[in-house]
Amino acid sequence: CRYMAPEVVMGQKRPDSHTDRFSLAVVLYMLLFLNHPLEGKRTMCPCLTEELERKFYGSDPVFVWDPANDANRPVRGVHTNEIKLWPLYPAFVRKTFEKAFSHEVMVGNDTTHRVIEKVWQEVFTTLRDLTIKCSCGSETFIDPSQQSCRCINCGKSIERPPILKVKKYHAALAPGKKLYACHVQYDSDDFKEAKGEVISSRNNPSLLGLRNDSNNTWEAILPNGSSKGYTHPDRKSGSAGMPRPIS
C-alpha cells in the first residue's frame, strides 16, 4: 500500500488516472530523495500493524515536509539522505511536491486535482535546464527565485546567470547550455530536440550569445526597438519567434 493513493488504500475507490498520479508523485519523490514521502518520525513504530498502515497511508497521511504540519518530519540518523537532499533542490521542485502531498490533494476535497504528468515534465525539464557546472567541476542547480546560489558539492557561492524565460520554462544562460524546441517555439513542449546553444564571444568570454541551430529564423528585438532575423547559415529558414533573456 506504500505506493497506493489514500482512497485506494481505504477501499473507497479503484485505481484510475487520478490515483495513478499520486503513485507517480511517490515514485518521483523516492527517486530524488531516497525515502518515502509519508514515512517520518510518525511512522517509526516497533510494529507496523495493518491498522497503522491504513492510518499512515490511507485515512491520515502526512507529508514529511508538510509546511503546515511538522508531525511527521524526517528523523536525523534515520532519514539522512532525505534531510540532506531536500534543501538542495530549487524551490519550484519542493513546492510541486508540497502540492502533490498536501492534505487537500491526498485526502481532502481536491483529490481530482493532483499534479498531472505535463506539470512534472515542465518541472524536470526546467530542473535540467537550470543545472550548470561550478568551478569545482561539479554540476549544481540554479534557483530562479534566488539572486545567488551555492554549489551543492563544494558550497561555493555562485552568482545567478541570466535566465531565459519562455512560457513555463526557464533555462540558465551559461556557455554550452542547449536550447530546445520548448524554449524557442511558443507552440512546442518538445524538451528533447536541441534547437540552439548558448555561446560566449571569442574576444569577450563574459559576453553571451544564442546560436541558432534550427531551420527557423529567430527574430531579435534590438535595444532601439528595431528587429533583426538570425538564421543558421547552413540551414533553410522558416520563421519562429525569439525568446527574450531576463536577468
Placement of each model-derived feature along the sequence:
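Short cysteine-rich clusters marking metal-coordination/redox-active sites
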Residues: 133-137, 148-154
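Cys/His-rich microdomains that often coordinate metals
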Residues: 138-145, 157-160
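N-terminal beta-hairpin/loop module of FHA
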Residues: 160-200
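Forkhead-associated
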Residues: 207-235
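Protein kinase subdomain VIII
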Residues: 1-14
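Conserved C-lobe activation region of Hanks-type protein kinase-like domains
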Residues: 16-22, 27-96
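Terminal C-lobe "cap" of eukaryotic-type protein kinase domains
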Residues: 98-131
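Conserved small/polar residues in nucleotide/adenosyl-binding loops
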Residues: 236-243
